């Protein structure tokens, strides 16, 4: 089983595409999805000019030779999107064209997230070259560090915060570093008439890897320790499924007042959190977490684009994140941030700050610890084997970002240079990964659900709102397929034209071979197929409403094997709304066989 989230337009066409990957030895597996496309064209970029004190100048049009926006999308998206131009690799944005960022589901950010004034002509900024090293920096799990390390980490963050007071425009300062995420993620840069966004696509992993790389080196510079390494929040292991204690010490430089106070003091983390507390035991919650990790790292991500996310497409707002970005990356942000709609002591309304909103996430030191483990998952995923390897598509490899190094020198960086952490000078201290062997085996049901008692899909859809659990029967295009047929084609459970207001949290879970009596708080069951999730979005330039229109696909070949439904012509599907279901509509659902 593998999941794909895709944008749709008024008409959708399903297409088989191919993607080249870097050459690593592997054994083919049944669930493999490939994408490919050719593009090479220049186009104009319309950018807002704003200086660092927030004063906006007139709009400029900048000729960009390398502006991405990747190739087609996942399956139907490739042909459904009206392309404004052929896509080319995304360049590092011209920081002189930075505009005001917007709070997701809120007003403009009340300050400028743009970087300090450029010391030189942007076109002359060099590409970064790794400095020589004699020893790898080793990132360790945050729950296992000693007091000596905590003191050193506190000192580094404290000195970074001090720069905010003494040199507010110093790019090494704490707020300036946090603003990097705000600018790249909340609409400060306009490319091709659309906000540049490093989430929801294949840019997610490489952007954050480079971001942490320079952040880590800056911390080391501030305490004169070139071997200093960030910790990682080991939330994929039961021992790390809590807020790391060093971040929960009031008065320390690692503490953030704008966190959800309910997650303190050893509260078990919910890797599927979408704002509501799950009424279950700590043991069940940890079991759910390990199940989610297995689904997102193994079952749902047998091939690169499912893990990394879709290519970024020119002229279209890509909303096709990879598995780990959706869960657990997003839920950890939500879990740690303040509750949206609650009030701060000064009377301001929360938009999820700090961790729960991209513009402010970098203001919480735990953000970098969280993304340390997200980055570690990239390494762990490739280590599983099979088709799990880095993308070799040039539009990905040649995409660029911009950062200041620890000496305040500006550099451009490419995705192709961040594929090997050891070449970058760091590695991760090994920890057991119990989720790798946590494939759900117990079943929520005994035998096959009687599908004759369920309404057929064509009587349930179109669905106006998902305000309750919904079960239906759906026909398969073929049954009793041979192994060769499974290798050649993936069986895809496809939800066409899902619509919802993108200003709120959205999540619904999908189960096979259960009815509406399923206990949806127990995810460690073989019938759990996956989840559709969405965070509140920034209202993008050119949008006339807040309605998201997406397709959602789950590859179910492996799942049908696990629950013994390979020979059935009709199967039962159950949808369980977890967040925002009353605002979700779905046009239709079908099962397709798609070439791999």
UniProtKB/Swiss-Prot annotation:
Localization per Swiss-Prot or TrEMBL: Plastid, Chloroplast thylakoid lumen
Residue sites binding Cu cation A per the record: 181, 199, 208
Cysteines joined through disulfide linkages: 98-114, 113-182
Keywords: Chloroplast, Copper, Disulfide bond, Metal-binding, Oxidoreductase, Plastid, Thioether bond, Thylakoid, Transit peptide
GO biological processes: pigment biosynthetic process
Job of this protein: Catalyzes the oxidation of mono- and o-diphenols to o-diquinones.
Protein name, as recorded: Polyphenol oxidase B, chloroplastic
Species of provenance: Solanum lycopersicum (Tomato)
